[in-house]
């Protein structure tokens, strides 16, 4: 690598670090890290690590009954707190900063295997622009940044067909946040062909069973707080807010442009990009049924799923060749 390439790379990493600091310090301090939210965050942290619902239940605090099985980040923070004496809220803030920084770096590296540095940087710039939305409308969901890092690595490994690396990342991801249980579906849809579908089906089924076992095991071990949700009420609530706020609806602001560009780029996308679009749609449907969909923080994985096809759509608008017209890079070039 030339000296100029090192300089450009270093400056890009530095810029991503600055973005992370700005987001966490100047956006986060006025929202989820504010003094107003401090008591709620501390109470919910204690509830998770001790597996005891807070007073009034999870829903009364803007959480849900499955929060206590998203164990990796709260347990890590509790361990670091006991070992170092650093305040819990400061540790959460530090983890968010590191994870946002890592997410931007990994996102750029992933895209740069298929797209130019400028195109990859543009996608990262767009992601940075919508990051403030991920701080809004909630007080305590400390696993979403780390979950995004795990999703990025899993998507990268899935595209590169590195099954064992994908499996390792997926195992960690489901401990961070159980929505990663669907990742084997992307591995299969993105890679299976008429000649290889049996291989990828067996691999996806194997890791899927392991992830499901972990999920059910956590649910069984940490049971006692489950409350049956009315999913129809949740769907109606989400659509009512979606229609009522229109263009100002946070997911519309965050994902409207990538979705349009991904549709435009669908024809010139390769198999994995097309599978990622359908997979993103499936995730969106699940989230509309199960969560407060206006909270962009829980939908961040849609960006790396849509971005490659969206960049193909941008190329189409600019009259440049898409992914199917360019010489693809070898699938074994994954560098982590």
Residue ranges and their predicted role:
Residues 1, 182-209:
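Perimembrane helix-loop-helix junctions
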Residues 108-130, 149:
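Transmembrane-helix signature of polytopic, membrane-embedded enzymes
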Residues 126, 133-152, 176, 298-299, ...:
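Multi-pass, polyprenyl lipid-linked donor-dependent membrane glycosyltransferases
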Residues 152-157, 164-177, 183-189:
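Membrane-interface alpha helices of multi-pass inner-membrane proteins
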């Amino acid at each position: 690598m030339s000296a100029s390439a090192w300089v450009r790379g270093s400056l890009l990493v530095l810029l991503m670090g600055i973005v992370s600091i700005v987001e966490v310090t100047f956006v986060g301090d006025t929202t989820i890290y504010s003094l107003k939210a401090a008591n709620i965050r501390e109470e919910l942290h204690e509830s998770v690590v001790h597996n005891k619902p807070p007073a009034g239940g999870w829903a009364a605090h803007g959480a849900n009954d499955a929060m206590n099985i998203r164990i990796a980040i709260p347990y890590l923070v509790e361990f670091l707190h006991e070992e170092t004496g650093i305040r819990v809220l400061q540790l959460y803030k530090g983890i968010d900063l590191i994870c946002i920084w890592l997410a931007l770096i990994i996102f750029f590296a992933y895209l740069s295997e298929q797209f130019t540095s400028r195109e990859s940087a543009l996608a990262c710039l767009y992601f940075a622009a919508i990051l403030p939305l991920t701080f809004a409308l909630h007080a305590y969901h400390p696993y979403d940044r780390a979950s995004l890092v795990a999703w990025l690595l899993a998507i990268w490994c899935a595209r590169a067909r590195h099954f064992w690396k994908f499996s390792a990342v997926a195992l960690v991801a489901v401990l961070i946040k159980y929505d990663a249980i669907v990742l084997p579906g992307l591995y299969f849809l993105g890679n299976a062909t008429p000649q290889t579908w049996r291989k990828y089906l067996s691999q996806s089924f194997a890791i899927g069973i392991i992830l499901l076992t972990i999920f059910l095991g956590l649910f069984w071990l940490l049971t006692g707080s489950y409350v049956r949700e009315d999913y129809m009420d949740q769907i109606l609530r989400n659509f009512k807010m979606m229609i009522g706020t229109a263009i100002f609806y946070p997911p519309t602001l965050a994902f409207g442009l990538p979705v349009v560009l991904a549709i435009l780029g669908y024809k010139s996308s390769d198999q994995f990009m097309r599978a990622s679009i359908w997979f993103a749609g499936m995730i969106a449907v699940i989230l509309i049924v199960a969560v407060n969909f206006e909270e962009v923080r829980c939908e961040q994985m849609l960006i790396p799923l849509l971005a490659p096809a969206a960049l193909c759509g941008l190329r189409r608008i600019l009259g440049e060749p898409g992914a199917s017209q360019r010489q693809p890079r070898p699938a074994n070039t994954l560098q982590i």
